[in-house]
Amino acid sequence: MKKITITDMKKTLIVGTVAYDDIETAKGSSGRVLGGSGTYIALACSHFASHSSVVSVVGGDFEQRHLDLLNKKGIETSSIEIISNGKTFYWKGKYHNDWNKRDTIITEVNVLEKFNPIVSEEFKTPDVAVLGNLHPLVQKSVLDQLKTAPKAIILDTMNFWMDTALEDLKSVIRRVNIIVINDEEAKQLSGKESLLDAAEEIQKFGLKYIIIKKGEHGAMLFGENQHFNL
């Protein structure tokens, strides 16, 4: 894979959750707020990609103002399916004084349980594809719909899928260039305790880059024969 630059991100396909969160901390509660991996990947990409699309699903309770927010940022939302008689994915959690620790209080999968992503014709030839944290088979179905190989495919995943769908996850990882996971997930996926050893083992899937998140301590980027802290 050649070096990716900002100009390569003209057309970016994003698949992930568009959701509602409720977050408690020692300082107070957010109440019901806009959340989801698809949402925040898209908002981040809006600073770089000239044209991006989010593929997701929401319920009839999803507020129009939140779609308007994405649209105002130049993000295509026509591939966000709205199931009028269903409810949007909802997560409530509590963070402790140690921000690396959190408790899940409520998870309501709702319409996401039967999410079947459909990529529009226009975005079957993206420059960059970003696969948010979803079931590996959902991520695979997106890759299967693409007509051309993107310059970069970025995959986010988590320990839950390693516990419940490991072989499916490994199959998808072999088809992407970049993976994003946290330090504990890197150790679990690789079977190694050292992050350096973990990254080296994970690169055997054929990955170009590995991003390992370390909470309040930032992240580490690993490439071929090199790594640095972010």
How would you describe each model-predicted region?
Residues Y20-R32, A49-V130, D144-P150:
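Conserved N-terminal subdomain of the carbohydrate kinase-like
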Residues K11-L13, D127-V130, A152, I178:
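Structural motif
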Residues T39-S52, E201-K204:
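A short, N-terminal amphipathic alpha-helix
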Residues G28-L43:
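Short catalytic helix/loop segments, enriched in acidic residues and glycine
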Residues K2-S29:
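Positively charged, low-complexity intrinsically disordered leader regions
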Residues G59-D61, N133-V138, M158-M162:
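Short beta->alpha connector loops
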Residues L43, W91-K94, G218-F222:
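Short beta-strand scaffold segments in enzyme catalytic cores
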Residues K147-A152, W161-N229:
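Conserved phosphate/ATP/ADP-binding segment of small-molecule kinases
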